[in-house]
Amino acid sequence: MPISTAEVEHVALLARLKLSPEEKTAYTEQLNAILEYMDKLNALDTRDVEPTAHVLPLRNVFRDDCARPGLPREKALQGAPEVSEGQFKVPRVV
């Protein structure tokens, strides 16, 4: 099911994006190309393909977690633009 320009406009409105007519056309074409490709992928027979999480046999290699002393409070607060009662003071977020 192809995406219409009206649907792209609706999504842009929800995302608070202002798109030019050229951008609307381009995004409509790009999204439709993606959906066509998805249809091709959905048509593939994958019954005999083993599910994998990663195509390469790799594992994450992590370093050991070592606790180390942190910065003293005074040193950490030195570069702060504003400090109150030994803590960073930041503008209120409403």
Swiss-Prot record:
Q: Which GO terms describe its molecular function?
A: asparaginyl-tRNA synthase (glutamine-hydrolyzing) activity; ATP binding; glutaminyl-tRNA synthase (glutamine-hydrolyzing) activity
Record region (Disordered): 72-94
> Record's superkingdom?
Bacteria
| EC top class, as a word | ligase
Q: Which InterPro entries match?
A: Asp/Glu-ADT_sf_sub_c, GatC
Family that this chain belongs to: Belongs to the GatC family.
The name under which this protein is listed is Aspartyl/glutamyl-tRNA(Asn/Gln) amidotransferase subunit C
Q: Which organism is it from?
A: Moorella thermoacetica (strain ATCC 39073 / JCM 9320)
Lineage of producing organism: Bacteria, Bacillati, Bacillota, Clostridia, Moorellales
